[in-house]
Amino acid sequence: MLTLNSVNHGTTKRDKNRFCGPAVISALTGITTAEAARRIREHTGRRQITGTWGDEIKPVFADLGVQMTPARIDGNGYLISDLLIEMLDVKAQRRHQADQRGSGMTFAAWLKATERERSGNQVFLLSSGHHWVLVQRDNFVCGKTGEVVSVDHPKVKRRARVSGIWLMNQINDQQAAA
C-alpha cells in the first residue's frame, strides 16, 4: 500500500533538487530528490531537471514499483479511466495538456467532486497549476510544502487549475512479470 511521506531532500546540498517532479517521486517512494532527478535524467537524456511532463516521470515511477494510470472525473464527480490519453503519442498528449491549461476545474472543485473516491487509501497525482502534487484522503504533499499537510493548509493552492489526474498504485510481482 502506498502512503504519502515528506519530501526527502537528503543530508547534503548535493542530495537536493527543489523542483516538483523529483519531489513527488521522493514523497511517494522515499528516495532523495537528487536520486529522483538522476533517474529522470537517465530516462530523458536531459542535463538538468527543472520541469517535467507526465511521460518523463512515469518510467521512473515504474522502475520504483509504482504504476501511474491516467484518470478523469466525469460530470458527476466519478473517476473514469482515461485510456484515450494513454493511447495518444507523446506530442499529441502534450498538445492536449497545453490546450487544457486555463480550463477545467480548480483544485478545490476537484477536492469537492472526489470526496467519495478519496475516502480510501488511493493516492492521486495531479498536475495542478503547472505543478505536481500528491493527494491521499485529505493529506497533501508537494515540493512547496515539503511535508504532508492538510488540503486546507495555507500553502495549498486551491484555486489552481487541474490539468491532469493519475491514480498511483503499487505494482505487484504479477504485474511486473507481465
Label every PLM stretch briefly.
Residues M1-T3, V123-S127, W132-L134, R161-L167:
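Ordered hydrophobic segments in well-structured contexts
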Residues T11, A23, I85, A92, ...:
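Low-complexity, compositionally biased segments
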Residues M1-T50, G54-P70, A178:
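Active-site nucleophile-adjacent alpha helix/oxyanion-hole segment immediately C-terminal to the catalytic cysteine
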Residues N5-N8, N17, N76, N121, ...:
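Detector for Asparagine
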Residues V141-A178:
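Noncatalytic regulatory segments and standalone regulatory/sensor domains
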Residues T44-H130, Q136-G146, D152:
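Conserved active-site-adjacent core of cysteine acyl-enzyme catalytic domains
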